[in-house]
A protein has these predicted regions:
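A short SAM/SAH-binding and catalytic strip from SAM-dependent methyltransferases
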Residues: 126-136
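Short "lid" loop at the C-terminus of a central beta-strand within the Rossmann-like core
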Residues: 159-164, 180
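Residue-level detector of anion-binding/catalytic polar loops
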Residues: 103, 153, 197
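A short, conserved alpha-helix within the catalytic core of class I
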Residues: 134-144, 158
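Short conserved AdoMet
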Residues: 77, 135, 149
Length: 211
């Protein structure tokens, strides 16, 4: 029996099917997930990420990230220490932060795998276009809760599930590395489960506050 990767309940039901994969929705937390048999191997997953060409010199990409970064900067105190979780091969958030005198460390499973960074505590953690790639979001969110200081902020950017009709035409689901998809209901469930306060920043950006 398949269990939800976020809440571990077995209330999964078919949500969508295409030529590549099937997609299941949890009746408890609302997450839409791809069964493990469709997940890429680590080598194939990294090969997909190796194609990314995002750099700090790409003004379009900086503008894209600024929809998370600028609201975050407005909410943190001077001297705050942050972590960019899943920064990718060309970290940009930390570069943008440094330009404003903010210290951000880079962590990525494939490109900046520095486990010691996950043993420190932070005033904020950013995950921009990351959480949809994570096979075990329950464990990850609990880990991030443990490294966030009290009143710390978790900033997440990921496109949100609206409904089945929109999902069926959604380009976002076609990326083979995207395996978990979040709706507003899902983020509300996460907030209740971890006692985090949820703030909706944009159509694809949410902030959680550890209280």
């Amino acid at each position: 029996m398949l269990h939800c990767p976020l809440c571990a309940e077995n209330s999964l039901r078919k949500y969508h099917q295409d030529k590549q994969r099937s997609y299941l929705q949890c009746g408890t937390c609302g997450i839409v997930s791809v069964p493990a048999k469709y997940h890429l191997s680590p080598a194939d997953e990294k090969a997909q990420y190796d194609k990314h060409r995002n750099t700090a010199e790409d003004l379009g990409y900086r503008m894209f990230l600024s929809r998370t970064f600028e609201p975050l900067v407005a909410r943190i105190k001077f001297g705050s220490l942050g972590l960019d979780f899943g920064c990718g091969p060309g970290p940009v958030i930390s570069r943008m932060a440094k330009e404003q005198g903010i210290m951000v460390s880079n962590y990525d499973l494939y490109y900046f795998n520095l486990p010691e960074l996950l043993e420190r505590r932070y005033d904020f953690v950013t995950m921009t276009e990351v959480i949809e790639h994570v096979a075990d979001p329950q464990s990850l969110l609990m880990q991030l809760d443990s490294i966030l200081k009290q009143a710390g902020i978790l900033a997440i950017m990921t496109k949100r599930v609206i409904d089945q009709r929109a999902f069926s035409h959604w380009h976002y689901k076609n990326d083979p590395t995207h395996i978990c998809f979040y709706s507003l209901k899902t983020f509300e469930w996460i907030g209740r489960k971890l006692s985090w306060r949820l703030e909706i920043i944009d159509k694809d950006v949410v902030f959680f506050y550890k209280e």
